């Protein structure tokens, strides 16, 4: 039978392509593009809000940004583009006409100062003045180069941060962390501190603005006016911290944490109360419409009266993905923190839409804004939390909480109600195994499908028969014989102490036959590369793999750890001394390690590095990879970082059970091409033959064990084939199954 299947939209994402998800909530800057749109810079990238239809378009590094942490933004009406400043000191210009980014990196290479964040821009003709954390830089637009850096202003210390810059009345004026400084534009040597007149202000100057012929400065103590003699307080203006300033032809807008104050040209004030405690920047259009960049709500649009419209792009609450896991429905869950300290919520991605969770109630303890581990059982998604116990979400997102008040779970020694469940794993019988951290006894729990919860670890039977009382359980995995591999720490939860392997011998209700063995860095006790084990995974061949503070290790035969002598772990030589935070194993049995230096991909046997992904050679959001999750059904690899979630589409898709229909894409296949043709729908270890219309064998493509193979359009001699019709014939490893599909090749 001939199956001719062309590429549906389902396969629009090609193997090797990336997608990034970031939070657009924490806004740093805002700029108005004429009258049609507002641009917002955030610590997750850039977005454009169309004021006419409400449409939001987002930009990350994949769409052309140099990086995602934006710190400054200015619309250049003369060039119809955006000047974008980044935390790193990089500066980009985004031309709106052709949507092209030009990036200038000179300031990132300044080594004299540690902080190089861009704070503000001021455009004047061919000059762009750039306020930075170490001073003021002059960029000549036509020459596309930085001409000078000014780092000393009058009596202020060298490298004082500049928060804003303004040119008015023949003066170059800078707002700094120590106060205000000004110099004449006619000066021939602005690098000389003596050319600058400085005015110290306690708390510094936050922003500058000009209204008519008057120059104003925002300070921690209210609004200041700059005169020939210096700075003086604006009469009648309240003495409070002014965060930001903006102007129209008539009005000056001053933003404080509790109100927006409008100063008219005649000096009168109009005050509008509001909660602006998280606001950071302010912009207005020609009609006086106000737009505020906010740390929590992203963009606030102030309407008539007291109306405030909140514009928040659909995105996760935070860019911190300390945890990333996938449930049985293919939904992606991320958590801002492993622990409760510093937690900023957790989030779930389903069908391209994010749902955020924070401050969920847990009776008897503080609200929960994170999770530490996740498993699925039936229609239920079960989350272990740091302090809140166990959270169960059903298919309708109804929440059930199990904690100290209604279950056997025990809190930490200092607080019985603070139940820490940092790791969950589910066995083939549907039993959810749970690590209970920092408890005085019974650090292992089994949550049965019938709802019962059993405790393990403390039996009084002595060494080797119970969990070591001087250790606490942090992370848990299950091997092919249902033994539990538990990464442990010292009794106080601070120091890594290796792994405890627990065997219940298949008798959940009889602890008398339970066995425990400790594996650590000692000879004949496993010889781990480091006792701090950060992740444990079972590979496709039954071996146990570890990610530690000092490299990777594996036990080829996990059963051997209960022998007379514990065999030494095998090490991955190329990852020695590498801090490894996380681990995932794909359908091709490759090992993917997260680290502080990006992602490492190791061969199935651990003998070679196949690939490495960093911010320098890929769209990976950050080299600080905290967690990795893998979806076997789609081949997607998810990398949780401190700057968001990166997704790589890989060829490692779980193979089909039976070989029936093949899908070919792209079809027709135009060669030469930068992309490859994909044959999809294979069983494990299938072989694909490319055959010409006359029956000649053109190429053999062995499967690596996954659902698809790729063809570059070349024959066995490395030459591109001619235009015409070809067939892809797939044969199972045992030769009992086969499938065929037609390929149209167009050679250009």
Can you say where each PLM-predicted feature lies in the sequence?
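Terminal processing/anchoring signals of secreted or surface-associated proteins
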Residues: 12, 651-655, 664-667, 679, ...
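Bacterial Sec-dependent N-terminal signal peptides
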Residues: 1-17
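Short, glycine-anchored, charge-dense loop/turn motifs used at functional sites
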Residues: 687-698, 726
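Glycine-centered tight-turn motifs at strand-turn-strand junctions
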Residues: 697-721, 732-736
């Amino acid at each position: 039978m001939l199956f001719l299947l062309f590429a549906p939209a389902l396969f629009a994402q090609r193997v090797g392509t990336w997608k990034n998800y970031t939070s657009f909530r924490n806004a740093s800057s805002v700029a108005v593009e004429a009258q049609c749109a507002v641009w917002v810079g955030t610590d997750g990238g850039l977005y454009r809000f169309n004021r006419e239809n409400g449409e939001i378009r987002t930009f990350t590094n994949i769409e052309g940004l140099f990086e995602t942490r934006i710190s400054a933004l200015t619309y250049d009406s003369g060039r119809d583009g955006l000047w974008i400043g980044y935390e790193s000191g990089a500066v980009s210009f985004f031309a709106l006409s052709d949507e092209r980014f030009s990036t200038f990196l000179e300031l990132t290479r300044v080594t004299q100062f540690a902080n190089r964040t861009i704070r503000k821009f001021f455009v004047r003709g061919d000059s762009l003045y750039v306020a930075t954390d170490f001073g003021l830089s002059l960029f000549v637009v036509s020459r596309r180069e930085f001409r000078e850096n000014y780092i000393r202003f009058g009596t202020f210390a060298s490298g004082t941060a500049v928060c804003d810059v303004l040119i008015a009345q023949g003066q170059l004026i800078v707002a700094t962390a120590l106060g205000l400084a000004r110099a004449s534009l006619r000066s021939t040597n602005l690098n000389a501190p003596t050319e600058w007149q400085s005015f110290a202000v306690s708390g510094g100057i936050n922003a500058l603005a000009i209204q008519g012929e008057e120059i104003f400065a925002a300070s921690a103590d209210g609004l200041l006016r700059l005169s020939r003699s210096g700075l003086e307080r604006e009469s009648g203006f309240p003495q409070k911290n002014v965060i930001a300033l903006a102007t129209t032809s008539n009005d000056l807008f001053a933003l404080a944490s509790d109100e927006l104050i409008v100063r008219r040209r005649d000096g009168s004030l109009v005050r509008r109360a509001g909660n602006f405690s998280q606001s950071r920047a302010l912009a207005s259009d020609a009609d006086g419409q106000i737009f505020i960049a906010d740390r929590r709500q992203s963009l606030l649009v102030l309407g008539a009266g007291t109306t405030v419209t909140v514009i928040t792009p659909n995105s996760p609450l935070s860019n911190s993905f300390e945890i990333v896991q996938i449930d049985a429905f293919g939904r992606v869950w991320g958590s801002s923190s492993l622990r409760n300290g510093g937690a900023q919520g957790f989030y779930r991605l389903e069908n391209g839409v994010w749902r955020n969770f924070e401050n969920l109630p847990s009776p008897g303890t503080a609200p929960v804004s994170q999770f530490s581990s996740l498993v699925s059982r039936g229609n239920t998604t079960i989350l272990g939390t740091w302090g809140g116990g166990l959270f169960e979400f059903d298919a309708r997102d109804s929440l059930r909480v199990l904690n100290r008040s209604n279950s056997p779970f025990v809190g930490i020694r200092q607080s019985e109600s603070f139940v820490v469940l940092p790791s969950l794993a589910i066995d083939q019988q549907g039993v959810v195994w749970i690590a209970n951290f920092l408890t005085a006894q019974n650090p292992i729990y089994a949550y049965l499908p019938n709802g019962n919860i059993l405790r393990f670890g403390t039996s009084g039977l002595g060494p080797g028969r119970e969990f070591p009382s001087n250790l606490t359980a942090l992370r848990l995995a299950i091997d092919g014989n249902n033994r539990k591999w538990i990464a442990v720490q010292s009794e106080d939860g601070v120091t890594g102490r290796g792994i405890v392997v627990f065997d219940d011998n298949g008798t959940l209700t009889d602890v008398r036959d339970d066995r425990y063995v400790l594996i650590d860095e000692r000879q004949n006790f496993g010889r781990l590369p480091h006792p701090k084990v950060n992740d444990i995974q079972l590979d496709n061949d039954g071996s146990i793999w570890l990610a530690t503070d000092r490299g990777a290790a594996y036990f080829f035969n996990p059963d051997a750890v209960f022998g007379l002598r514990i065999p030494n772990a095998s090490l991955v030589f190329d990852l020695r001394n590498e801090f490894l935070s996380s681990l995932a194993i794909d359908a091709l049995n490759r090992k993917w390690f997260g680290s502080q230096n990006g992602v490492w991909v190791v061969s199935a046997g651990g003998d070679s590095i196949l690939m490495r992904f960093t911010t320098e050679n890929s769209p990976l959001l950050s080299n600080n990879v905290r967690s990795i999750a893998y979806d076997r059904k789609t081949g997607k690899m998810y990398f949780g970082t401190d700057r968001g979630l990166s997704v790589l589409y890989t060829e490692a898709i779980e193979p089909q059970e039976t070989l029936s229909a093949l899908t070919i894409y792209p079809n027709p296949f135009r060669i030469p091409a930068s992309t490859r043709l994909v044959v999809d729908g294979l069983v494990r270890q299938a072989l694909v033959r490319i055959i010409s219309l006359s029956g000649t064998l053109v190429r053999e493509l062995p499967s690596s064990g996954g659902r698809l193979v790729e063809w570059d359009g070349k024959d066995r001699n490395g030459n591109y084939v001619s235009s015409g019709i070809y067939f892809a014939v797939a044969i199972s490893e045992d030769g009992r199954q086969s499938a065929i599909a037609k390929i149209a090749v167009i050679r250009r």
